[in-house]
């Protein structure tokens, strides 16, 4: 699904969050949105999800104005938002049941998806019985089982330790490569953006405007990001973070 923003403004009362944002994102691209807290990055996700309407301008999906929420556009939060009274398998199956899939088929498919994210054997566990990383793996399975055309990720790994975060980044890359949704990723982790994204948009403080766009499609990536040192320094500079020790 292609996404397009045309001169988008968003206000909350007198608070101007987004001003004149333009952008076009192709099917299958992963675009990372990086910027200061509160600058409007998450609001852009909410506009695509259909949870908010722009104050001015248009947000289009495949050339059509977004009328409201749809399972074609799935939002994943930092907090996994699993139902605590349901097992992991039931949580994943719920995404299909809400689309009218019968329970038996939904549970069968959810078992397969839990295996895809290395949670086979944990189908009958409840969210409080597993680690944060396992809960977020479940959230990814629930997001992908419905085969969304757009995946909206709001700091999905921000609450996890470094090793778990890296492992889940790899899981996410594999799933995206296989299913090719268009992905918007909000993150404060510059290394995560460098590793995952095809393009990185660096935003100013509120109201959000794009300071610079980085194209990251020019080579294969690994968790060794040393070849992206120049891009990393430039992104941090744009964010106002000092990277060199003064003398």
Give the ranges of each region predicted by the language model.
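The feature captures the beta-strand-to-loop junction immediately N-terminal to the Walker
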Residues: 34-36
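Helix-to-loop junction immediately C-terminal to a conserved catalytic motif
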Residues: 49
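Conserved ABC transporter NBD signature motif
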Residues: 57-69
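Hydrophobic anchor residue at the start of the ABC signature
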Residues: 76, 140
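Short helical segment in ABC ATPase nucleotide-binding domains corresponding to the A-loop/adjacent helical element
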Residues: 89-97, 107, 111, 215
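Conserved signature/switch motifs of ABC ATPase nucleotide-binding domains
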Residues: 125-128, 146
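Catalytic Walker B motif of ABC-type/P-loop ATPase nucleotide-binding domains
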Residues: 151-154
